[in-house]
């Protein structure tokens, strides 16, 4: 038994690497949006198209990825996802060589297919490699922490590589893209030569009984899918627009801040999400998902409204990385509004888990199908920031956060009212 556990150490390490890659590649459109705004003269709407291209892939691949997992198993699904991810990042690198915004968007779209497939496979695969139970859950939680660390590092790294505004080109981000392709290549090589248990492959000939009901038969689940849709958009839109606000020139309504400093501030948002998840894990056993969701949604609305009405010339000190004079950290002055946007990371950190728990409560045998539909609704991470970018073009960056306020208000409604199961008459055993 000991030997078998040791034999899984390497694939487990590769799963952790893939957890890192999910956040790293998913987070790239934020700093890349700053780059394309400068290099291609993209509007705020256009600069968010990277997120749209990345997340809209979930709408196409969410359900097929789940079917693929059942048909061919963990290993082949993971290897396929890694291959697609390598190609997607490679296309983004190529976009810098040919100076093409369209090629960049194609790369982001292909990368989105990979991220959807990886999100489908890494959690159950890591749980299986850990032997299930507490050990499997422990590995998943550790993987989630690595995911948060990657989300923190991405804007900081690319922001540092960007340097001064005049030199913001995709080519400057090449070291980050090479790192991503290198990790993908290493993970592929390791997983290709390692045996992995496949407990959940479903034979093609298996006959499925027809069921008159499904997850969409439950009102609280339908409303929950909308909540997930807007949640992912909120999680992405808050830091992404803040990054644009800080880095864009004064003539475009921005603050013309150093990209490395802005990246560090945005990185703090993702770091606070890690802190929030750890706190959520501690209190989760004592506090209901409904109460937790209600509290964090209310707090997020308070933070957002304060940020919107705070004058931009009112500043506060925050720790940040500087690109001038080499790699260094220092306290820098940032608008108080930005600080409150960053604090929203504490609130968004526990929203996914809370919404998921509320939406699948009472679904019983329909829970697996519900998970696949949830993955489809992740596409909200590409659509809501696009809407926010459009509003920013028509008004200004700060005013665009009213889009986020409306989305969070819906999540508060879902926590207090929409999450109640009114279809308890449906048999779910």
Residue ranges and their predicted role:
Residues 10-42, 119-123, 238-246:
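Extracytoplasmic
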Residues 29-30, 216-267:
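Extracytoplasmic gate region of multi-pass secondary transporters
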Residues 49-67, 267-279, 380-383:
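Central cavity-lining transmembrane alpha-helices of secondary-active solute carriers
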Residues 60-102:
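Conserved MFS/SLC helix-loop-helix module at the cytosolic interface between two early adjacent transmembrane helices
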Residues 83-98, 299-330:
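C-terminal ends and interior cores of transmembrane alpha-helices
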Residues 101-118, 319-351:
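Hydrophobic core of transmembrane alpha-helices in multi-pass small-molecule transporters
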Residues 117-131, 348-364:
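Intracellular juxtamembrane helix-capping segments at the cytosolic ends
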Residues 136-195:
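Helix-loop-helix hairpin linking two adjacent transmembrane segments in secondary transporters
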